[in-house]
Amino acid sequence: MSNDDSIEFEGSVSETLPNTTFRVKLENGYEIIAHISGRMRKNYIRILTGDRVKVEMTPYDLTKGRITYRMK
C-alpha cells in the first residue's frame, strides 16, 4: 500500500550493503540508498547486484527509498 504523496522511480541495484540495504542508481542518474519493503522480506524475494527494481520515495527525503518491486 503506497501513499498518494510517494514518488516512484525505476533503477538498477549497483551495490549491496549490510542489513538488506542497497545502493540504487535511478533512471535519472541519481544514486540513493534503499531498503527492502516488508512484503518482499516476508516472501523471501532475493535482490542481487544488477537487478532492475522499482523504488518508492517520499518528497521529504530524496536520498533514501524503499524497494517495492523487482523486475523480471
Swiss-Prot record:
| Entry's localization field | Cytoplasm
PROSITE patterns the record matches: S1_IF1_TYPE
Q: Name one GO cellular component term.
A: cytosol
Please state every residue range assigned to the domain named S1-like: 1-72
Query: What InterPro entries would the database entry show?
Result: NA-bd_OB-fold, RNA-binding_domain_S1_IF1, S1_domain, TIF_IF1
UniProt keyword annotation of tRNA-binding present: no
Q: Which Pfam families match?
A: eIF-1a (PF01176)
The alphabetical list of record keywords is: Cytoplasm, Initiation factor, Protein biosynthesis, RNA-binding, rRNA-binding
Q: What does the record give under GO molecular function? A: ribosome binding; rRNA binding; translation initiation factor activity
> Lipid biosynthesis as a keyword?
no
Principal location listed in the UniProt entry = cytoplasm
Task: Note the PANTHER family from the entry.
Answer: TRANSLATION INITIATION FACTOR IF-1, CHLOROPLASTIC
On assembly, the entry states: Component of the 30S ribosomal translation pre-initiation complex which assembles on the 30S ribosome in the order IF-2 and IF-3, IF-1 and N-formylmethionyl-tRNA(fMet); mRNA recruitment can occur at any time during PIC assembly.
Cross-referenced NCBIfam families:
infA
**Which family, according to the similarity comment?**
Belongs to the IF-1 family.
Function of the protein? One of the essential components for the initiation of protein synthesis. Stabilizes the binding of IF-2 and IF-3 on the 30S subunit to which N-formylmethionyl-tRNA(fMet) subsequently binds. Helps modulate mRNA selection, yielding the 30S pre-initiation complex (PIC). Upon addition of the 50S ribosomal subunit IF-1, IF-2 and IF-3 are released leaving the mature 70S translation initiation complex.
Protein's recorded name: Translation initiation factor IF-1
Which organism is this protein's natural source?
Xanthomonas campestris pv. campestris (strain B100)
Q: What is the lineage of its organism?
A: Bacteria, Pseudomonadati, Pseudomonadota, Gammaproteobacteria, Lysobacterales
Q: Which gene encodes it?
A: infA
